[in-house]
Structure formats: C-alpha cells, structure tokens
Regions:
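Conserved phosphate-binding/catalytic loops in two-lobed NTP-binding clefts
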Residues: 323-338
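Glycine-rich phosphate-binding loop plus the immediately following alpha-helix
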Residues: 39, 168-197, 230-271
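Non-catalytic, solvent-exposed interaction/assembly segments
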Residues: 1-99, 133-136, 142, 148, ...
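Phosphate/pyrophosphate-binding loops at sites that engage ATP/ADP/AMP, CoA/4′-phosphopantetheine
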Residues: 54-67, 254, 292-308
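Adenine-nucleotide phosphate-binding core of ATP-dependent small-molecule kinases
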Residues: 261-308, 314-315
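Active-site neighborhood for divalent-cation/phosphate handling
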Residues: 71-201, 308, 338
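Short flexible coil/turn linkers enriched for glycine and charged/polar residues
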Residues: 7-10, 64, 74-76, 109, ...
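Gly/Thr-rich phosphate-binding beta-strand-loop-beta motif of the actin/hexokinase/Hsp70
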Residues: 1-33, 66-73, 202-233, 237-243, ...
Length: 338
C-alpha cells in the first residue's frame, strides 16, 4: 500500500515496508507542491490539477504499488459520541440510520455512516465529548457547539457509541482523484483516525490519560482530544501555517520558497532570529487562543484536563513551535513521532 495525504499546499506520499512482524521501514517518501487555488479552505477546486500532481509524484518516487490509502477531513465529516440502549453490534447496525438522523447536520441519504461501540455507561453520566463535532468554526465559541437533540431513549442500561458520517461526494471526489492517478483506492479513512493510528505505533495512547493530538496544517489546525485511548472531542480551526507564511513574506519581502526555509529555521545572515520568532508568535496567537478555548470547553463538560499535547503536521516542523505551545498552554508539548 501507498499512503496519500492531499493537503492544501502539497501532496505527501509515504510507503512503508514491514520487515518484522509489527515493525515497518520507510521505503518511499515524497512531496509535490500544489498551486494555491487547487484546494481552498479544504475544498478541492481543481481536481484535474491535483490528480496530475499526484501522477507526477508517483512517477518521481518510482512507486510500483497500485493500491492506495487516503483520508478526508473538514466540514464534510461529522463525529459524535452518542448514547443508545445496550444492544449488539448487529442490532445497532440495523438501527444506525435512524439514530444518526437526529444528530448529523447532513441529509441522511447523502452520507456514508459508520459507528464503533465504546462500551456501557451510566445513562445519567454527562460526557463532554457528546457535544464534540468535527467541523466547528474558529469564529464560533466551542460553548455553542451543543445544538443537537438530546438522547430521547427511555431510562435503562445505556451504552456509548462513536458515530461517524461523511458526505459521499467528498469520498467520491477523493476516490476519483486516486483513480485518475492510476491508483486503486483501498481505504478512505478519516484524518483523525489515521493520526491516532500513527501515534499508536510508538505510544500506548490508552495509558496517557487525556491528551490533545494537534495537526498543524497549512489551512487548518485540527484538534483531536483523546481520553484513555478513545476519541473524546474534535475541532477544526480554519487558521494554519499558510497564515504564518504570508506574515513572513510581508515582513521580510522574501519569495515563497525562501519563506518556507525561514519557517524551518534557515535564516539568512541579514535576518535577526528574534524578529522571526516574534512573527511566528504573533501568527500562532489566534490558533493558541482557540486551542485554549477548546481545552477549557472539554474540561468543563468532561471534568478532565489536558495532560499533554502531541504536535504533528507541517507546522510542527517550525523551529521552536513546541516551546510556543508549551508556554501558552501550560502543559508538556512534544513533536509526534512518527
């Protein structure tokens, strides 16, 4: 399998080879930049150009495998913990459409549904993650993210399930791009679950308490709060590393490529590192404010505080970004490996 990450500014490609049971070696990695108008605010505007860029990347990296995995995220994705009466997986599978209709903000006929049973819970227990949603706007207070109907089941033994809905046209769009690049789609996952799986390769998330896995993308910052190894809350903030790139270009009057080098810590002799750090801090202030709001919202509803932050995504490569986040959020911050 080859893994394809289609982001706002570039396409990333990774291929792993299992050399021992459960142990993998990175055998291929490549990246192909995309024009700024190819993907806007997470939506693919020029699928033909994206497919051509993917074709060129596959050719450049000499990829032989035709089977691909990819992932989707953003406003087309809905994730929510729900409570339902205790039943078997087969029974819930037969009733999931009826259950989902009272929660999801999309036409039920236009989405692909899935679920995972998380276990029995006290019917009267309030869980903050019940009000979590994948596509909350950064301009909306997290406290407003509670507009869905409350569970209306009669009192009795209840269980918790993770409900996932994805608009079919987004899945079809991603599938078509892979096929246009002469690949065979094997899996279309959700970004949040793909990141959790990647983190789980090197860290036992179930033993880490309550952590935040934060993906610093170019157009979006994705917050994923994981509690004892299970998804607890997700949020998308429509501000990312692209905002920092624009600020650096404006400040230092450098072309795009040189600005990317600056973000990686490659300063020219004419620059003062303190000035770069100041711009980075100002650029991420808005993101950090929104992350802090999300942490407070989750803590208020779940009675759990964030114990650690794991950073990933292109923004995590910015020199010193983990220090900025740790200073502001007052929790330990690490760069995720892998």
């Amino acid at each position: 399998l080859v893994a394809i990450d289609i982001g706002s500014s570039s396409i990333k490609l990774v291929q792993l080879t299992e050399f021992k049971e459960g142990q993998y070696e990175l055998t291929r990695f490549g990246m192909m930049p995309l024009d700024a108008d190819c993907i806007v605010e997470g939506a693919i505007k020029k699928p033909g150009q994206v497919a051509n860029a993917l074709k060129n990347l596959i050719k450049a990296e000499k990829i032989q495998s035709r089977y691909a995995v990819s992932a989707v995220a953003g406003e087309a994705v809905f994730i929510k913990k729900i409570k339902v009466p205790v039943m078997s997986e087969e029974e819930l599978s037969a009733k999931i459409t009826q259950e989902a209709e009272q929660y999801i903000p999309f036409d039920i006929d236009d989405v692909a549904l899935d679920f995972q049973i998380l276990g029995a819970v006290n019917a009267d227990k309030e869980e903050g993650s019940e009000d979590s949603e994948e596509s909350e706007s950064a301009d909306d207070s997290p406290q407003d993210n509670d507009e869905h109907k409350e569970d209306s089941h009669e009192e009795g033994e209840m269980m918790e399930a993770l409900l996932v809905a994805v608009q079919r046209d987004v899945i079809d769009e991603r599938t078509n791009i892979l096929m246009e690049a002469d690949l065979k789609p094997a899996i279309i996952d959700l970004d949040v679950f793909a990141l959790m799986n990647a983190a789980q390769l090197t860290t036992d998330l179930s033993t880490m308490g309550t952590i935040a896995l934060i993906d610093l993308g170019d157009s979006f910052t994705h917050i994923n709060i994981i509690q004892d190894g299970a998804m607890g809350y997700t949020r998308d903030i429509p501000v990312g590393g692209g905002y920092l790139t624009n600020m650096l270009m404006s400040k230092f009057q450098f072309p795009f490529k040189q600005t990317l080098d600056i973000k990686r810590g490659k300063f020219s002799s004419s620059m003062k590192e303190e000035e770069v750090i100041e711009v980075i801090a100002r650029a991420y202030k808005k993101v950090l404010e929104e992350i802090q709001k999300s942490f407070e919202y989750f803590s208020t509803l779940s009675d759990h505080k964030i114990e650690r932050v794991l950073l990933c995504g292109g923004g995590s490569m910015i020199r010193g970004v983990d220090g900025f986040f740790a200073d502001y959020l007052k929790v330990p911050v690490e760069i995720m490996d892998p």
